[in-house]
Design a protein with these regions (language model features):
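Glycine-rich flavin
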Residues: 2-6, 22-29, 34-168
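Glycine-rich Rossmann-fold phosphate-binding loop(s) that bind the pyrophosphate
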Residues: 12-15, 36-37
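Residues forming the Rossmann-fold NAD(P)(H) cofactor-binding site
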Residues: 18
């Protein structure tokens, strides 16, 4: 098992965690950030950003469909009906998420922050273990910032379904 010591350990690379890690790195502190998924958190990877991209695509499709109607709209006409190819829309959304994720990772790197992929398991108040067995990494820090985000909760009076969606 390898051991890594640092001044600041941030657990969670969502909007709270990566901003804290970047700032610590900018201030010259030896900083490590641990993320179990992709840098950017729920908002960037599967929540706000991808949702807004899909809403924008739906709005654009709706506007184009109006132009495709007989006679067009605003003097703009499109021959034939507007067509949505969902696989193309999803690929476009995924490209946005990938680009922003790479941007967050670049900001961390440029600030001198080490990004470790994995799930942090506390061994004591200032030590975490990532991974298992001989490949595990033990990180000991002087300071620990918990920025592990949130998880969606289904409310008993508002079940997930056709009109209620979750980021999961």
């Amino acid at each position: 098992m390898k051991t890594r010591n640092c001044k600041v350990l941030v657990i969670g690379a969502g909007p709270g965690g990566y901003v804290a890690a970047i700032r610590a790195g900018q201030l010259g502190m030896d900083t490590v950030i641990v993320e179990g998924q992709r840098a950017g958190g729920t908002c960037l990877i599967r929540g706000c950003i991808p949702s807004k991209a899909l809403i924008h695509a739906a709005h654009t499709f709706h506007k184009l469909a109006g132009h495709a109607k007989k006679g067009g709209h605003m003097g703009i006409s499109i021959p034939g009906p507007a067509e949505l190819k969902m696989e193309g829309t999803i690929a476009w959304k995924d490209a946005i998420v990938d680009r922003l994720n790479k941007g967050v990772e670049a900001l961390l790197k440029n600030a001198g922050v080490e990004l470790v992929h994995g799930w942090a398991e506390f061994q004591d108040a200032k030590t975490v273990k990532i991974g298992k067995g001989k490949d595990a990494l033990l990180i000991q820090a002087e300071n620990v910032i918990l920025a592990n985000g949130s998880i969606p909760v289904e409310l008993p009076f508002m079940k997930y379904g056709e009109h209620v969606l979750s980021s999961k």
